[in-house]
């Protein structure tokens, strides 16, 4: 790619750069190497020079769409031009990174467009994969810090980059670059790095602003009714805790202080003990009751017939619905008796050996909607069969 960017090179050095600041003019001796796709200079010495030189200017370029173009700008200071949209916030709370699409729309899972190898939809599937490859880039925080790692005691005191209570970052938001960034390659992905690590104490170093595209009240055409639908992942809501099944504390996800919080490699998933179960349930109940929805599709709720959970003899419903019933009871305790009901499982269900310990489910408000007929569990379609790879 043709550009006028000042040449840049990543310098790896853990000893000699602590006293340097942005703008210093230095002489670096070392050895060039390729480290997992990033060209870097492994410094043996760094000398600060007294000469006065002009600071490098950022190159104003559109996002390079090919690896060849990106390589020509690797480690260089650029001022990104064109449209950028938030497309992924999955690892923002862990690594302080935000996935961007270099276009005016976020990416879709390619299987939304089609199925790999399918005669009719395979081309659409591949087209979305190609778009992700051409337009995908991460906005990083200038650090490799894992905010969930307990070996960093200052994690609890370091605010997550880019986020604040009054400025959430949502998929679909427009991204505007206000400061230059460095085009970087690490962890198998191209990234925009700020010129210094974002710590919460240097908010002015944040190189972007976000513009929300969400309206407070969506504009809806006049319809004959007003039913609100929502979906909510309860993230392994189980009716039995890990400590009740005798799971070892070595098989637990822990908080920053090393206390067990959720199950890992246990006979159940979800909360570690009663206190964490109540904390999980309280968050779910508050969130769902504040959705304003009339029908909610739930994901990752316990299949009580399959999981190693205790279903009391007093429960008169289908065994697989027990955890679901406890969540509905908790919702009604806060919202009022009878506010919520769940759609019961059908009498005919798949064999337990082909079911998972988690499932999907529907809850609804009887005052707004009613069920018609018996439910069905769809198992005869490739689209619902994970063993087929989609």
Regions found by a protein language model. Name each.
Residues 28-37, 46-51, 83, 87, ...:
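Sec-exported extracytoplasmic/periplasmic mature domains
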Residues 1-262, 280-281, 369, 377-390:
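Extended non-catalytic accessory segments flanking core domains
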Residues 200-361:
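N-terminal, active-site-proximal structural segment of metallo-dependent hydrolase catalytic domains
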Residues 339-390:
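Extracytoplasmic mature domains of secreted/periplasmic and thylakoid-lumen proteins
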């Amino acid at each position: 790619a043709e550009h006028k960017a000042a040449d840049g090179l990543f310098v790896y050095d853990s000893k000699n750069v602590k006293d340097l600041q942005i703008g210093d003019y230095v002489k670096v001796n070392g050895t060039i190497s390729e480290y997992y796709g990033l060209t870097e200079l492994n410094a043996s010495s760094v000398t600060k020079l007294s000469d006065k030189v002009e600071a490098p200017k950022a190159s104003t370029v559109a996002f390079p769409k090919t690896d060849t173009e990106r390589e020509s700008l690797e480690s260089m200071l650029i001022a990104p031009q064109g449209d950028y949209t938030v497309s992924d916030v999955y690892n923002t709370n862990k690594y302080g990174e935000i996935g961007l699409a270099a276009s005016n729309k976020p990416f879709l899972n390619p299987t939304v467009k089609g199925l790999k190898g399918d005669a009719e939809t395979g081309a659409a599937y591949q087209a979305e994969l190609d778009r992700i490859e051409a337009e995908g880039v991460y906005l990083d925080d200038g650090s490799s810090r894992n905010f969930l790692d307990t070996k960093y005691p200052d994690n609890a005191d370091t605010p997550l980059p880019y986020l604040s209570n009054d400025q959430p970052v949502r998929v679909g938001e427009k991204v505007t670059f206000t400061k230059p960034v460095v085009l970087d390659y690490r962890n198998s992905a191209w990234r925009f790095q700020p010129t210094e690590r974002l710590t919460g104490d240097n908010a002015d170093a944040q190189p972007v602003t976000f513009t929300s595209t969400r309206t407070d009240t969506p504009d809806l055409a006049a319809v004959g009714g007003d039913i609100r639908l929502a979906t909510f992942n309860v993230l392994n809501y189980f009716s039995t805790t890990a400590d009740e099944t005798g799971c070892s504390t070595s098989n637990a996800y822990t908080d920053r202080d090393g206390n067990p919080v959720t199950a890992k490699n246990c006979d159940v998933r979800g909360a570690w003990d009663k206190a964490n179960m109540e904390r999980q349930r309280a968050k779910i109940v508050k969130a769902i009751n504040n959705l304003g929805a009339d029908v909610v599709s739930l994901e990752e709720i316990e299949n009580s017939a399959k999981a190693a959970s205790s279903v009391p003899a007093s429960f008169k419903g289908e065994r697989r619905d027990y955890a679901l019933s406890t969540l509905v009871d908790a919702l009604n305790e806060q919202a009022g008796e009878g506010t919520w009901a769940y759609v019961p499982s059908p009498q005919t269900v798949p064999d337990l050996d082909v079911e998972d310990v988690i499932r999907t489910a529907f809850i609804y408000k009887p005052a707004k909607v009613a069920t018609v007929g018996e439910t069905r569990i769809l198992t005869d379609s490739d689209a619902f069969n994970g063993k087929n790879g989609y």
